[in-house]
C-alpha cells in the first residue's frame, strides 16, 4: 500500500476541520512546492543523479534547511534503490513518507502540549516583537477554553507600547481574565501576581506574555530568567511549557532567533505563526531536525480557531493533499 493511501485512511479518520485547516493553511507552500515537484517528475523519464540534484534545489527553496535536505536526499536514494523505483512519479509518495519519518526521528520529544489535570499548568510565551506572540496567546486561550479549561492570562510584556491593551482585547474576546500592572512595571512582579490570581481562581492554565525587546539582548534574556525563577518558586516544576513564537514567513531568520532563545532559556516547543502566509513551509522540518525542538502549535490563518496543535501527518497531507486525495481507494 502506498504511503499516500495510508495517509488518506488516517486523515479520513480525523475530524474534517483539522485536515482542512492544514490543507488551507499550507496552500501557498503546497502550490509552490507541488508545482515544482510536478514539473520535475514530468521532465524526467528515470530517477537519476540529475533528478536528485534538482529535487535538492526544490527542497532548499521551500526552506527545509540544507542539513535536513541532505539527510532527506540520502534517505530517498536508499529507498529508491531498495524498492527499485524507476518512475519519477513514484518518488512523490516516498518523499512524503520520509518527511514524516525525519520529523518523528531523533530525540524523543513530545509534540503535544504538556497540560495535565489536577494542577495549575503554566505556559510561558517568548519571542521577539512582531512575530504574533500576543495573538498566539489569545488564540491559545480560546483553544483551551473550548476544551473546557479555565484560563488566566498574564500581561508580562510591560515594555512594548500597547502590549497590555492588546492582551486585554484578547481577554475580552475570549472571556478570560487578564492580570496586569501599568506599563513599565517589573514583569516578574506581574507574573507573581498572575500565579497567585490563577491559584485563587483554581485555574487550569496560566498563559504568560513576555517582552520581545528590551534595551539590549542581554537585558531581555536576564528578564526571562528572572520571570522563570519566579514561576519555579511559586509552582514546582513550572513553567510546564516555554513556547517560542516564530514567524514562518521569516524563514532562516526564524532559525537564528530559535538558536538565540534556546541559549537563554529551555525552550520546550515552537509556536510557528503565519504558516499560511508563506510558500516556504519547509521551515517546520528544519526547526525540528536541526534545532531538535518540536513544533507544538501552528498558526494556519487569521481566525481565532486557526491555531492548531502540530501533527506531522496532517502537515504532509497539507503539502500533498491533491495527490493523497487521488490515492487509489
UniProtKB/Swiss-Prot annotation:
<feature type="binding site">
    <location>
        <begin position="273"/>
        <end position="276"/>
    </location>
    <ligand>
        <name>GTP</name>
    </ligand>
</feature>
<keyword id="KW-0675">Receptor</keyword>
<dbReference type="GO" id="GO:0005886">
    <property type="term" value="C:plasma membrane"/>
</dbReference>
<dbReference type="InterPro" id="IPR036225">
    <property type="entry name" value="SRP/SRP_N"/>
</dbReference>
<dbReference type="InterPro" id="IPR004390">
    <property type="entry name" value="SR_rcpt_FtsY"/>
</dbReference>
<dbReference type="InterPro" id="IPR027417">
    <property type="entry name" value="P-loop_NTPase"/>
</dbReference>
<protein>
    <recommendedName>
        <fullName>Signal recognition particle receptor FtsY</fullName>
        <ecNumber>3.6.5.4</ecNumber>
    </recommendedName>
</protein>
<dbReference type="InterPro" id="IPR003593">
    <property type="entry name" value="AAA+_ATPase"/>
</dbReference>
<comment type="similarity">
    <text>Belongs to the GTP-binding SRP family. FtsY subfamily.</text>
</comment>
<dbReference type="GO" id="GO:0005525">
    <property type="term" value="F:GTP binding"/>
</dbReference>
<dbReference type="Pfam" id="PF00448">
    <property type="entry name" value="SRP54"/>
</dbReference>
<keyword id="KW-0472">Membrane</keyword>
<dbReference type="GO" id="GO:0006605">
    <property type="term" value="P:protein targeting"/>
</dbReference>
<keyword id="KW-1003">Cell membrane</keyword>
<dbReference type="GO" id="GO:0016887">
    <property type="term" value="F:ATP hydrolysis activity"/>
</dbReference>
<dbReference type="GO" id="GO:0005047">
    <property type="term" value="F:signal recognition particle binding"/>
</dbReference>
<keyword id="KW-0963">Cytoplasm</keyword>
<comment type="subunit">
    <text>Part of the signal recognition particle protein translocation system, which is composed of SRP and FtsY.</text>
</comment>
<keyword id="KW-0547">Nucleotide-binding</keyword>
<dbReference type="GO" id="GO:0005737">
    <property type="term" value="C:cytoplasm"/>
</dbReference>
<keyword id="KW-0342">GTP-binding</keyword>
<dbReference type="InterPro" id="IPR000897">
    <property type="entry name" value="SRP54_GTPase_dom"/>
</dbReference>
<feature type="binding site">
    <location>
        <begin position="209"/>
        <end position="213"/>
    </location>
    <ligand>
        <name>GTP</name>
    </ligand>
</feature>
<dbReference type="InterPro" id="IPR042101">
    <property type="entry name" value="SRP54_N_sf"/>
</dbReference>
<dbReference type="InterPro" id="IPR013822">
    <property type="entry name" value="Signal_recog_particl_SRP54_hlx"/>
</dbReference>
<dbReference type="GO" id="GO:0006614">
    <property type="term" value="P:SRP-dependent cotranslational protein targeting to membrane"/>
</dbReference>
<feature type="binding site">
    <location>
        <begin position="127"/>
        <end position="134"/>
    </location>
    <ligand>
        <name>GTP</name>
    </ligand>
</feature>
<dbReference type="GO" id="GO:0003924">
    <property type="term" value="F:GTPase activity"/>
</dbReference>
<keyword id="KW-0378">Hydrolase</keyword>
<dbReference type="Pfam" id="PF02881">
    <property type="entry name" value="SRP54_N"/>
</dbReference>
<comment type="function">
    <text>Involved in targeting and insertion of nascent membrane proteins into the cytoplasmic membrane. Acts as a receptor for the complex formed by the signal recognition particle (SRP) and the ribosome-nascent chain (RNC).</text>
</comment>
